[in-house]
Amino acid sequence: VKQRESQKDLLELATKRYQENIYLAEDYLRSRGITIEVARLARLGVVAKAEVGHEGFLGRLSIPYITKSGVVDLRFRSLNPAVEPKYMGMTGADTKMYNVLDIERAGDWIGVCEGELDTITLGKCIGIPCVGVPGANSWKKHYTRLLADFERVFVFADGDQPGKEFATSLARELPVTIVSMGDGEDVNSSYVKYGADYIRDKMGLNDER
């Protein structure tokens, strides 16, 4: 238990230090429709000076996974489109559901999408309670149990084959409403191009006002 606590303390410390550099990602975030204020709410940061063990993530956007007990994981996204891999995780870390705090904040329904930036776009830019998984292939059985009490689960399907397969597989397990993005689009790119009402229209929410 002590080892787990010290690991959490290190993750919290790293998150705080990386947050101080978020201004370095301002142009990138603006291109994704994410303001610095929203980035701060999500506790995003930049690895300007790497903490011990994070040397391989230098220059990347840091994305903390936050639960009621604090920061439990960090993932890192390249700010340079030419640099692969686009996303990197902590060595030996298992994939986790992102933004789980929204499960308690949500009412009768919740959204699910791929990727942390899509989740931030829905949850903090548009105001749609939402959780995310880092890729279509990382869904786990216990995620289904976490969402089993919702009357409706909006699954935001990226406009590619893996996205469609992700939505279809969830529809076998949960009361799903599939919200399909256009070909080659995802939640974030659709929001940047067309705005929040476009997403809400696709969900049918604007009709319910």
Predicted feature locations:
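TOPRIM metal-binding catalytic domain and adjacent DNA-binding surface shared by DnaG-type primases
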Residues: 1-62, 67-68, 104-105, 203-209
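Phosphate-handling DNA/RNA-contact segment within nucleic-acid enzymes
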Residues: 49-152, 166-167
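Short, surface-exposed amphipathic charged segments that create phosphate/polyanion-binding patches used
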Residues: 60, 145-150, 186-200
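Acidic beta-strand-to-loop metal/phosphate-binding motif
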Residues: 112, 150-162, 180
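Short, acidic/turn-prone active-site loops that include or flank metal/cofactor-
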Residues: 133-139, 158-161, 181-184
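Switch/connector loops and helix/strand junctions flanking conserved nucleotide-binding motifs
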Residues: 163-165, 189
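Short, aromatic/basic amphipathic alpha-helical patches
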Residues: 165-174
